[in-house]
């Protein structure tokens, strides 16, 4: 037993000003004795005598301390030691032979959950005493002994009178291999006095260092530092809390010291100075010198082990990093301390039959909600935005204590599957995020198992931490709860629809969830959105699918932010708002929503099931996954660019059932929209082609609604909706001609003598040639250039069309002023005015009824200016690229060997190479945190182009040419027929009925009629929502 003493008044002084007036810095010279009997010198005794007792020590007799202990103390110690009051002795019991971890009686669980540990310096050379032998004080009111040992580290816990916890560790008997790379004393896993308080639990508070500190020292709880709050992130519940971020000056290999505040007197290289405050340069360098670069510390020692397969499958339970465990508030269950890896060697459809299973099923838990997050190569910011949004939603479910379904342990009923499309496509820093959360570990996965190719790598872990889009860690102190995660890293890139097949056909049959939710990385569900989606299924047993409101990310509150300064973002914001307010609500009332956005939608799992013959929604949904060449018609291939539309139709028209689809206004998901023109054009190419051919598919199979299990009233609404969709599709087909006809009529009408505009005829001819030339240029660009390679050409076309729109709007105002003046004398003019008022009045009134009118102010003008871009450029590019429907790399049949293989042995086991040392696992964890902090440049290999079969390309290009020819000719014929009349006399005072005048009236009435139908549907939706609460 080793005894040492301290002044009884020290604790009182510390409690008064939260600073220890008796800072104590241990030194090896305080250790005296010989052999197994080693004593610690009391630094407060001026005589240097030691209080001693027996203490088992690995140290030799070579160094009996003879130096005066006062010589190594800082000046403050030398000044106060003479004034030290009576001594009070505490005891610590340490038994290095004890291999079991023991706890001090009488201390609460919070003591151990809050105590941190620090790695000591390397062991001394032979015949030398260790410079890292530390002492720690126990509370004056406690005499209970404390002993502990974890893998050779003996931890001395201390608690000040003010209730501040700390700990020190002393290594004994470590391998030289591990000691060479040991972390410095103030490692990121230790807890010291913090410059900023970070809302610890009430059981412990931030306080002083275990030894006290000299003036000027500022410790950080590495790797965190306080930063200015970013109000762009929707973290309402954290508004009162300071933010924590990964600091660049942490113990992870930074240049400015080992976890110290670089602005303090002891930050940076000053800690390793030749003659520091602590005197001895060897002492300073041992404890506070700069750590070697992280890259030089990588050991990656792997050991070959024989592992018995589980029913023929490779399944490993891997311990999580030590540092991660110190952050956790729950450590009792295996799901928090081990990560489960499964090497899946079968097709998704055979997952259950090949004896694979999932952790929640092993625990016997019922899965109420199963959430799929699909991603491809998105970066860590988009991933964390989605991930943290889901975690906050799960926390809300657990806060509903009065719910029969949810409550305190509601997180056990929610499982989140993160499915990444291609191991070599995933963003490296997303893997760092998952590693920081404990979900992913490098070096575990394998390419082959007993001669079978691995199709997907499954990592299962229940995390208690989250990382938001600012890369700030959040945990239980922010009200978050654990989340069960299944990370499916597909070996090959096989498109998003294949990711959904893993979700629906592999994982769902194991967990049998009630409701499934589909999310894309980059979409952030707002705090209660997932609950509102789930509630729509709970209230109505006939609901098979539901979606929320998809909002464009504007980086501001109430949908108003700096991104609206980008006209592309503003136009998309207006488009999203009108679609949600008018289209989704109308379709919801009828019972069939043409598309539940894959970015944020929900489905009842039982409604998705196929019948006994294998026919049903999921069978139709996955039909187009492996279509190749001319064996697949162009309609089917393009249709599966909008695969979510197929799933919606198959649900609503399912034979013998009466499933309906609902829009849930309260469930909001915020998503990034393209900010650049090339990305915008490429995205809309997929959307337009997919939606067009999916609409053709739905119209062709309208009879399935009649054979469904809906009642007569619902069937009538569904048939009417099909007719409504057909009329809209026809109108959109002739959109290219309609816009040009209106431009030609409005501008040519200014040539009427009553306007008294000289030279306007010549100007109009010039503008009309500019218009037609831009349209022809758009065809040429679309046929021969990718938007990414012709960015400025496309921007020039967008600007020209916007200027032409301005001219057309000026002409429209002048013509409208004349129309208003002649309303009483000409019925046709009156119909024009009424149609225009009805169209724009619907936008205004419906937005006001929905309590969401801001988009009319912030985004309407931008949408008008970009309207010709939507009608001309986007449609031209989409139709001219019907042959391009691929999402990824088809035909990728190569087998990678970079992860290694699992080889069978003669003893019925397999030989596998794994990182076994805990230090290697911990080092990999530190690397992940370091990568998130520094964000190193990602170097990707050259993208390989997928090989296309000649007949496949010929077939699709031939279809493309036929469709474009039919579309262009039909629009040209319509324009020529209408404009063959007297366009200049459309608004003439002479009156009379002309072809152009009749055409304008019919188009305006049609647009107004469609708007009124949507307005009626929107109003009915709001009424039903109000009645149902």
UniProtKB/Swiss-Prot annotation:
Subcellular location: Cell membrane; Cytoplasmic vesicle membrane
Positions annotated with a glycan in the UniProt record: 37, 401, 514, 527, 689
Induction comment: Expression is up-regulated in the mycelial form and shows a maximal expression in the log phase at about 14-18 h of incubation.
Keywords: Cell membrane, Cell wall biogenesis/degradation, Cytoplasmic vesicle, Glycoprotein, Glycosyltransferase, Membrane, Transferase, Transmembrane, Transmembrane helix
Transmembrane segments: 723-743, 760-780, 796-816, 830-850, 860-880, 963-983, 998-1018
Compositionally biased tracts (Basic and acidic residues): 191-202
Polar residues bias: start-end ranges: 76-91
Reactions this protein catalyses: [(1->4)-N-acetyl-beta-D-glucosaminyl](n) + UDP-N-acetyl-alpha-D-glucosamine = [(1->4)-N-acetyl-beta-D-glucosaminyl](n+1) + UDP + H(+)
Gene Ontology MF terms in the entry: chitin synthase activity
Membrane topology annotation: Multi-pass membrane protein
One Gene Ontology cellular component: cell septum
Gene Ontology BP terms: cell wall organization; chitin biosynthetic process
EC number(s) on file: 2.4.1.16
UniProt-listed InterPro entries: Chitin_synth, Chitin_synth_fun, Chitin_synth_N, Nucleotide-diphossugar_trans
Start-end of Low complexity biased regions: 46-71
Stretches for region Disordered: 1-29, 46-105, 168-209
Pfam families in UniProt: Chitin_synth_1, Chitin_synth_1N
Protein family membership: Belongs to the chitin synthase family. Class I subfamily.
Biological role: Polymerizes chitin, a structural polymer of the cell wall and septum, by transferring the sugar moiety of UDP-GlcNAc to the non-reducing end of the growing chitin polymer.
Record-given protein name: Chitin synthase 3
């Amino acid at each position: 037993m080793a005894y040492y003493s301290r002044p009884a008044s020290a604790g009182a002084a510390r409690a008064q000003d939260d600073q220890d007036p008796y800072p104590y810095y241990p030194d090896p010279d305080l250790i005296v004795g010989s052999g197994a009997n080693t004593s610690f010198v009391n630094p407060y005794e001026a005589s240097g005598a030691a209080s001693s007792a027996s203490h088992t020590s690995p140290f030799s007799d070579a160094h009996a301390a003879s130096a005066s202990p006062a010589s190594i103390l800082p000046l403050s110690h030398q000044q106060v030691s003479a004034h030290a009051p009576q001594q009070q002795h505490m005891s610590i019991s340490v038994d290095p032979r004890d291999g079991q971890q023991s706890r001090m009686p009488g201390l609460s669980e919070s003591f151990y959950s809050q105590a941190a540990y620090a790695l000591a310096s390397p062991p001394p050379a032979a015949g030398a005493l260790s410079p890292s032998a530390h002492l720690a004080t126990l509370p004056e009111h406690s005499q209970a002994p404390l002993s502990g040992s974890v893998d050779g580290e003996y931890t001395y816990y201390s608690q000040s009178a003010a209730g501040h916890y700390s700990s020190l560790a002393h290594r004994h008997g470590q391998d030289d291999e591990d000691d060479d790379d040991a972390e410095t004393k103030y490692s990121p896993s230790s807890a010291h006095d913090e410059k900023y308080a970070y809302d610890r639990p009430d059981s412990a508070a931030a306080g002083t260092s275990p030894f006290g500190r000299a003036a000027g020292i500022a410790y950080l709880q590495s790797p965190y530092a306080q930063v200015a709050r970013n109000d762009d992130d929707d973290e309402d519940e954290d508004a009162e809390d300071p933010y924590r971020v990964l600091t660049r000056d942490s113990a992870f290999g930074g240049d400015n010291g080992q976890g110290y505040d670089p602005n303090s007197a002891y930050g940076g290289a000053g800690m390793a100075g030749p003659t520091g405050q602590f005197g001895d340069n060897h002492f300073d360098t041992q404890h506070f010198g700069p750590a070697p670069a992280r890259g030089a510390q990588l050991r990656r020692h792997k050991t070959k082990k024989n592992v018995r397969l589980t029913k023929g499958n490779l399944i490993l339970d891997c311990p999580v990093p030590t540092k991660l465990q110190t952050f956790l508030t729950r450590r009792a269950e295996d799901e928090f301390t081990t990560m489960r890896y499964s090497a899946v060697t079968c097709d998704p459809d055979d997952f259950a039959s090949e004896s694979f299973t999932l952790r929640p099923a092993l625990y016997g838990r019922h899965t109420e909600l199963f959430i799929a997050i699909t991603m491809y190569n998105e970066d860590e910011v988009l991933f964390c935005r989605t991930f943290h949004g889901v975690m906050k939603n799960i926390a809300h479910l657990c806060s509903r204590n009065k719910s029969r379904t949810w409550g305190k342990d509601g997180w056990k009923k929610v499982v989140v599957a993160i499915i990444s499309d291609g191991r070599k496509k995933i963003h490296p820093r997303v893997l760092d995020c998952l590693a920081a959360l404990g979900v992913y570990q490098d070096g575990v996965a394998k390419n082959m198992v007993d001669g079978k190719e691995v199709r997907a790598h499954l990592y299962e872990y229940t995390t208690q931490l989250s990382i938001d889009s600012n890369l700030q860690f959040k945990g239980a102190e922010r009200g978050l709860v654990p989340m069960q995660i299944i990370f499916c890293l597909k070996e090959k890139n096989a498109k998003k629809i294949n990711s959904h097949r893993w979700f629906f056909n592999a994982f769902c049959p194991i967990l049998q969830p009630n409701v499934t939710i589909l999310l894309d990385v980059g979409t952030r569900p707002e705090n209660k959105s997932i609950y509102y989606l789930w509630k729509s299924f709970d209230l109505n047993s006939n609901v098979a699918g539901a979606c929320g409101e998809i909002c464009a990310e504007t980086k501001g509150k109430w949908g108003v932010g700096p991104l609206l300064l980008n006209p592309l973002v503003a136009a998309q914001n207006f488009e999203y708002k009108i679609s949600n307010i008018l289209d989704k609500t109308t379709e919801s009332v009828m019972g069939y929503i043409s598309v539940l956005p894959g970015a944020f939608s929900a489905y009842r799992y039982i409604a998705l099931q196929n019948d006994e013959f294998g026919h049903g929604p999921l069978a139709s949904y996955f039909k187009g996954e492996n279509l190749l060449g001319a064996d697949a018609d162009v309609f089917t291939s393009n249709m599966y660019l909008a695969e979510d539309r197929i799933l919606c139709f198959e649900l609503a028209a399912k034979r013998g059932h009466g499933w309906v689809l609902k829009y849930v206004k309260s469930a909001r998901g915020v998503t990034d929209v393209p900010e650049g023109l090339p990305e915008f054009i490429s995205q809309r190419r997929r959307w337009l082609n997919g939606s067009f051919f999916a609409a053709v598919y739905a119209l062709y199979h309208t009879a399935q609604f009649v054979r469904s299990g809906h009642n007569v009233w619902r069937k009538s609404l569904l048939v009417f909706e099909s007719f409504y969709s057909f009329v809209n599709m026809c109108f959109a087909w002739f959109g290219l001609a309609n816009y040009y006809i209106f431009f030609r009529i409005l501008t040519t009408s200014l040539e009427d003598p009553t306007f008294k505009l000289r030279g306007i005829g010549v100007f109009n001819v010039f503008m009309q040639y500019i218009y037609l030339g831009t349209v022809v240029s758009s065809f040429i660009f679309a046929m021969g250039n990718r938007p990414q390679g012709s960015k400025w050409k496309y921007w020039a076309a967008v600007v020209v069309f916007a200027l032409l729109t301005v001219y057309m709007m000026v002409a429209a105002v002048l013509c409208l002023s004349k129309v208003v003046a002649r309303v009483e004398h000409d019925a046709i003019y009156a119909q024009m005015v009424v149609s225009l008022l009805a169209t724009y009045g619907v936008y205004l009134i419906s937005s006001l009824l929905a309590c969401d009118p801001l988009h009319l102010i912030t985004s309407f003008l931008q949408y008008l200016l970009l309207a010709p871009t939507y009608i001309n450029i986007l449609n031209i590019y989409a139709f001219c690229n019907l042959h391009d429907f691929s999402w990824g790399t088809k035909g990728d049949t190569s087998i990678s060997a970079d992860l290694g293989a699992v080889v069978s042995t003669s003893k019925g086991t397999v030989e596998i190479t794994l990182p076994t040392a805990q230090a290697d696992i911990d080092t990999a964890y530190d690397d992940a945190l370091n990568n998130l902090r520094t964000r190193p440049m990602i170097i990707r290999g050259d993208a390989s182009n997928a090989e296309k079969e000649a007949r496949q390309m010929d077939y699709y290009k031939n279809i493309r040419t036929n469709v474009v020819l039919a579309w262009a000719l039909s629009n040209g014929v319509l324009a020529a027929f209408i404009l063959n009349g007297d366009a200049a006399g459309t608004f003439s005072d002479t009156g009379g009925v002309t072809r152009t005048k009749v055409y304008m009236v019919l188009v305006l009435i049609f647009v107004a009629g469609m708007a009124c139908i949507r307005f009626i549907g929107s109003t009915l939706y709001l009424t039903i929502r109000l009645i149902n609460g």
